[in-house]
Swiss-Prot record:
Family the UniProt entry places it in: Belongs to the UPF0102 family.
Organism domain of life: Bacteria
Pfam families the record matches: UPF0102 (PF02021)
UniProt xrefs under InterPro entries: Restrct_endonuc-II-like (IPR011335), tRNA_endonuc-like_dom_sf (IPR011856), UPF0102_YraN-like (IPR003509)
Coiled-coil features, chain-numbered ranges: none
Organism encoding this protein: Campylobacter lari (strain RM2100 / D67 / ATCC BAA-1060)
Protein name per UniProt: UPF0102 protein Cla_1413
GO MF terms held by the record: nucleic acid binding
NCBIfam families: PRK12497.2-4 (NF009152)
Amino acid sequence: MALSQYLFGIKGEDIACEYLKNKDFEILERNFHSKFGEIDIIAKKDKILHFIEVKSTQGNYEVAYRLDGKKYNKIIKTIEYYFMKHKSNENFQLDLLCVYKDDIKLLENISY
């Protein structure tokens, strides 16, 4: 991955965190890693853990389509690892936050 792509992704995650904070989410962790993959943001709101995948674009295409089945399965395995590591049984959901040029969309409780 080129440095410019990496920095663009970080900027998208920064924008996502600010958006979530403004919507009363508490940011618990960023870039949680396991051997299976990474979760961009782990946040909490109303006693529910939100595992949030952030996708950003400068183009004119639907960024949500960049979350494919392979990536989805890696995220699910990483969520399972998170619960094993933290010995938690909290309610949770997987969300997709799309950052467009001048728009942000939060798609909650997604499945594939």
